[in-house]
Every structure is written in structure tokens, then in C-alpha cells.
């Protein structure tokens, strides 16, 4: 992510050219077909339909078909894991569905296979203005994926624990967070200020719980798409986390803790603060109806006044390079990214829109969703792992060195230098 991009509301995530493959020509044909008379059937493979209310996505497809006579959409829906397997098999065989739901972590692999079409010219030809998009994933100058809706990771705070510790409001700066974490931990009874999952089996804590401190102050772990882990922004954030660990305010067991463990610790009232996905709000409410909690932006460095980055995960979308019907596929992408449809889809998903002109209606939802949308609107979506080569391994490499630093086996500077070397090897 370039610094220029971070200043704007629209954020472009770029991937190193070394891992961007030239789009293949002469691919075998994708799943859509044409009937006599020129009618077109588009296959749309995704995991979204099962995660929405019954008939919600089909209803949007019906609206699209009504507005585009001659185009029919065949939804190929399944759980996330099976959709991933299906898409990777289709990419390898050149039979990927016309339109595909995407996770940003898959993009590097698909790009190396030349499996995704460049959405830039396709959307332009469809009459869609890319400047409306809150973010895009760009591989070697080509738009490989557009995030349709985003699920953000703000700071969750236990209202009762903060109040008991004498903290009047969720912390907004690093110094306020450290003070709050110390005050909560001082309550005793096995209570900790913050929870940090660092299990190497599921190393996404590096993305969501560590690098989020960098992004919250407008920093970056990349320079022109390449690793830059020894810069001041990353060093400052990791030094800060190391200080929190030295203060004894991080919940025990961080080295083996996974995201679900983190959520359980917070839900059971054993920690005062955590960084987590909005998707867990309903689960927390159901598991502990008596727990009162708030959400807020991740604290920034003291004195920082710019836009704050907030971690996110997306339902992304792309078009197969092997589709027989790229123009029609682009129409479907344009429809989903249009202001009105994107507002409706983000409302249905309790997520945030990928179109900057869209506004979800959370009037019938948990009020925290509206608060989260206000946080999201005031900052920018930040996840520099999207599209990187072997993103999970990069997190694991960093995790290993960070744990060694927290254990006192090396300094933070040494941990970052070794992580930088490991990442350069992967790139």
C-alpha cells in the first residue's frame, strides 16, 4: 500500500511483480454457456449464499436478471472451505466459474496461474467508475479482485471491567491503552488487560492483533510492494507490544492461543480488551447475554491525527480469465458494486460496503454495527497481507521471531531483521 493511497479513501493493495503472472491466453473455457438466440448463463461460485438469510443472494440475482434480459446467473454455493477447493481445482484445470467469490489470501496463487481476468478494462467497458471502490487488489498493474463487502476488526472493550478499573472511556491512544490495560490487570482475580493470540498453527494474530497497531497509525509493513519490517512504524508498534508484555498486562498463554481462544477469554470476562471481527458480536451476545461491551477504533500513536487503518476481511469478487462471457461477467460485478446494490448486500451481511457511496441500513441490527460503520467511514480498510505470496507463512515467520523477542531470546530489532530476511526469501 503506497503512502499516497493511504491518504485517499480508496485504497489499492498491490502485489510484488515477482509473484504476478502474465495472464494466459488460449485458456480452456469456463463454466458459463450460451443458448440458441444468444442468451448467456453465468456461473457464480461463492460461499456467501449460505452465510446470508435464505433467498437473499438469489433475490439480488433475480434483480440483476430482470435488469439484464438474456443473462441468467447460476449460483454455485457452498461452505468457505469447499468453495476454496473448487476454485483452486478450477483454476488449475482452466474451468473456473465465470464470476468467483475470492479471499484476498488466494490472489497470489491465482495470479501465478493466470486464472483471473483484469477487472480494470472490463469494468470500464461496462461503464463502471473504479473511483467508487473503497479498495481493489492489484497484481502487477492489473485489478485481480474487488472487495464487495468488508468485515472489520475494531477494539472490543469490556464496559464493566473498564469501569471497575476507573477507566471512563475506551482508549484512543497507545498511552491510554497501556494505562487501561495496567488498571484492568491490577484488579486481580486472573483478569488481564489485553489478549494476544500468537499460535503458529493459526498465525493470523500477526495480521489482526499485531500489524493492526501499525496500520492504526497510518503505517505500513511494505515499501513499493516489498517487505519493509525494520521501518520506524513497524518497530514502534512491536516495541509497544513488547512493553505491554513486560508490563504483564497480556493474558497468559499467548504463545498457543488462537482467535477462538481469544474470543472465549473476552466473552467469559477474563480480559478487558481485544481486537476482533464484528462477525463475533452475535456469538458473544449469545454466549454471555449479561456482558456489556463497546467497540472503538484501534488506538493510534500519541499525537497521530491522520486517517486510521482498520484491519478487515472481505468477500472479494473476480472474473475468470477462462470465461467465455467476460463482458456479461463484468456487468454482474458492476451490479454488485453499484451504490444501491452494495448498500443492500452490506446490510444483509452486517458488513461494510465496497462502494464509497453506499450506506448500509443497520436500523434493525445490533447498534454496534452502526458504531463500527462510523469507525470504518472515518478511516480506511487496511490489510497488507491481501494478495501477498504465501501470506500465512509470512505471518508464521513473523510470529516465530516475535515470540523469541517476547521470551527474551533476542531484541525486537533482531526479531524484525530476521523476519525481514525470511520475508524477502518468500518474495
Task: Kindly give the residue locations of the regions a language model identified.
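Conserved N-terminal structural module of periplasmic/extracytoplasmic solute-binding proteins
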Residues: 2-108, 289, 302-304, 328, ...
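Extracytoplasmic/periplasmic substrate-recognition and gating elements
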Residues: 62, 163-165, 239, 246-247, ...
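Hinge/lid segment of periplasmic solute-binding proteins
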Residues: 79, 104-153, 205-206, 216, ...
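A structural signal for short loop-to-beta-strand junctions that line the ligand-binding cleft
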Residues: 97-98, 126-162, 192, 306-309, ...
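Short, solvent-exposed loop/beta-turn-alpha elements that line the ligand-binding surface or hinge
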Residues: 117-131, 193-204, 216-236, 285-288, ...
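Extracytoplasmic/periplasmic solute-binding protein
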Residues: 144-148, 153, 178-227
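Glycine-centered hinge/linker elements that transmit conformational signals in sensory
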Residues: 181-182, 224-254
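C-terminal capping/gating helix-and-loop segments adjacent to ligand/active sites or protein-protein/ligand interfaces
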Residues: 354, 371-422
Amino acid at each position: 500500500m503506497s503512502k499516497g493511497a493511504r491518504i485517499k479513501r480508496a485504497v489499492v493493495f498491490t502485489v510484488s511483480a515477482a509473484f504476478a503472472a502474465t495472464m494466459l491466453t488460449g485458456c480452456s473455457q469456463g463454466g458459463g454457456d450460451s443458448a440458441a438466440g444468444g442468451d448467456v448463463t453465468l456461473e457464480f461460485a461463492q460461499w456467501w449464499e449460505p452465510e446470508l438469510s435464505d433467498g437473499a443472494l438469489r433475490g439480488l440475482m433475480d434483480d440483476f436478471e430482470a435488469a439484464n434480459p438474456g443473462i441468467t446467473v447460476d449460483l454455485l454455493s457452498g461452505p468457505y472451505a469447499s468453495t476454496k477447493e473448487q476454485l483452486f481445482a478450477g483454476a488449475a484445470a482452466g474451468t473456473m466459474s465465470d464470476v468467483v467469490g475470492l479471499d484476498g489470501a488466494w490472489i497470489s496463487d491465482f495470479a501465478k496461474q493466470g486464472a483471473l481476468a483484469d477487472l480494470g478494462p472490463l469494468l470500464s467497458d461496462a461503464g463502471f467508475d473504479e473511483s467508487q471502490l473503497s479498495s481493489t487488489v492489484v497484481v502487477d498493474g492489473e485489478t485481480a479482485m474487488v472487495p464487495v463487502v468488508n468485515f472489520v476488526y475494531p477494539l472490543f472493550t469490556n464496559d464493566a471491567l473498564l469501569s471497575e478499573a476507573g477507566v471512563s472511556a475506551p482508549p484512543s491512544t497507545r498511552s491510554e491503552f497501556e494505562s487501561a490495560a495496567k488498571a484492568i490487570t491490577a484488579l486481580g482475580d486472573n483478569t488481564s488487560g489485553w489478549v494476544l493470540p500468537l499460535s503458529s498453527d493459526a498465525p493470523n494474530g500477526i495480521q489482526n492483533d499485531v500489524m493492526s497497531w501499525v496500520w492504526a497509525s497510518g503505517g505500513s509493513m511494505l515499501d513499493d510492494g516489498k517487505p519493509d519490517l525494520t521501518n520506524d512504524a513497524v518497530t514502534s508498534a512491536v516495541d509497544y507490544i513488547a512493553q505491554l508484555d513486560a508490563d504483564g498486562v497480556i493474558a497468559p498463554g499467548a504463545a498457543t492461543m488462537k482467535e477462538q481462544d481469544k474470543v472465549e477469554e473476552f466473552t467469559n470476562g477474563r480480559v478487558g480488551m481485544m481486537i476482533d471481527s464484528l462477525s463475533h458480536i452475535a456469538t458473544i451476545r449469545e454466549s454471555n447475554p449479561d456482558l456489556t461491551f463497546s467497540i472503538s477504533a484501534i488506538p493510534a500513536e500519541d499525537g497521530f491525527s491522520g486517517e486510521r487503518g482498520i484491519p478487515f476481511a472481505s468477500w472479494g469478487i473476480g472474473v475468470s480469465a477462462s470465461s467465455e462471457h467476460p463482458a456479461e461477467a463484468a456487468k454482474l460485478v458492476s451490479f454488485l458494486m453499484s451504490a444501491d446494490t452494495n448498500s443492500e448486500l452490506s446490510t444483509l451481511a452486517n458488513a461494510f460496503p465496497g462502494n464509497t457511496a453506499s450506506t448500509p441500513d443497520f436500523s434493525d441490527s445490533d447498534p454496534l454495527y452502526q458504531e463500527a460503520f462510523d469507525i470504518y467511514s472515518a478511516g480506511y480498510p487496511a490489510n497488507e497481507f491481501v494478495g501477498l505470496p504465501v501470506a500465512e507463512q509470512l505471518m508464521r515467520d513473523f510470529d516465530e521471531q516475535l515470540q523469541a523477542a517476547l521470551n527474551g531470546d533476542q531484541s525486537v530489532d533482531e526479531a524484525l531483521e530476521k523476519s525481514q530476511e525470511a520475508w524477502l526469501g518468500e518474495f
